[in-house]
């Protein structure tokens, strides 16, 4: 397998001076939204003894369960994939007593790939798409 890329000219400002250099970047061939549940389920069904419908149901429930657990203040780690976590934020207040639940909110939900998962994925070769 290989990941398609294109070559684009971009500004390099690392030296303090603007310099145009060429870079390999993600191709627009990667569909926006990527592989959806149905396609993922079909692929997984071919590799396991489970039916596509069962896998789609599990994927759907997985999303709901992760959302529920994150909403309860838990982080969720899918072994081999990585953890899902939330970050909280609030506006600055003059005293600790002013930092009330109504002023604190989730600023983002993030995922950090498992190090082994990342290492293996980084071994994937890339394939240049001509101009």
Model region roles, listed by residue range:
Residues 1-57, 61-131:
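Strongly charged
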């Amino acid at each position: 397998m290989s990941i398609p890329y294109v070559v684009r000219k971009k500004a390099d400002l690392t030296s303090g001076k603007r310099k145009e250099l060429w870079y390999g970047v993600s191709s627009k061939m990667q569909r926006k939204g990527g592989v959806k549940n149905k396609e993922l389920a079909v692929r997984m069904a071919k590799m396991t003894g489970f039916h596509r419908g069962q896998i789609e149901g599990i994927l759907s429930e997985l999303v709901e369960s992760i959302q529920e657990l994150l909403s309860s203040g838990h982080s969720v780690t899918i072994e081999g994939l990585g953890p899902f976590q939330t970050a909280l934020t609030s506006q600055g207040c003059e005293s600790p007593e002013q930092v009330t639940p109504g002023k604190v909110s989730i600023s983002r939900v993030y995922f950090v790939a498992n190090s082994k998962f990342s290492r293996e994925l980084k071994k994937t070769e890339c394939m240049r798409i001509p101009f």
